[in-house]
């Protein structure tokens, strides 16, 4: 709600079906109801997808969440690949990472002093 007050756009990754079965938050809303964009990962209530001896195991939200978020990052990177300063931290194990990351921090430190 603080983000809404500050006019900051929000995105959530959640299971709408699972959320509808869970108790309401203290705001009487569910996560997908208060974000500007929600991505439904379609995970069933209970977050388990494998039946072993009539016991559901195997949380799926970790797998789908990681896949969805990394797919979004890859696509954003593809869209922004021609920017003067590539707006992503590069792993320190990659060539030119320090140079890229230093430029990135310098450019964005004014709006994010934690860099």
What is each model feature region?
Residues 1-73:
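Glycine-rich phosphate-binding loops that contact phosphosugars or nucleotide phosphates
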Residues 78-115:
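Active-site phosphate/pyrophosphate-binding segments
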């Amino acid at each position: 709600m603080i983000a809404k007050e500050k006019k900051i756009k929000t995105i959530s990754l959640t299971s709408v079906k699972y959320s509808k079965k869970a108790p309401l938050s203290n705001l009487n809303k569910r996560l997908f109801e208060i974000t500007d964009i929600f991505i439904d990962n379609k995970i069933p209530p209970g977050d388990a997808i494998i039946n072993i001896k009539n016991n559901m195991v195997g949380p799926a939200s970790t797998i789908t969440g990681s896949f969805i978020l990394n797919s979004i990052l890859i696509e954003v990177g593809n869209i922004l690949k021609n920017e003067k300063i590539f707006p992503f931290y590069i792993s320190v194990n990659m060539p030119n990472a320090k140079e890229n990351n230093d430029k990135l921090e310098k450019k964005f430190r004014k709006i994010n002093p934690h860099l």
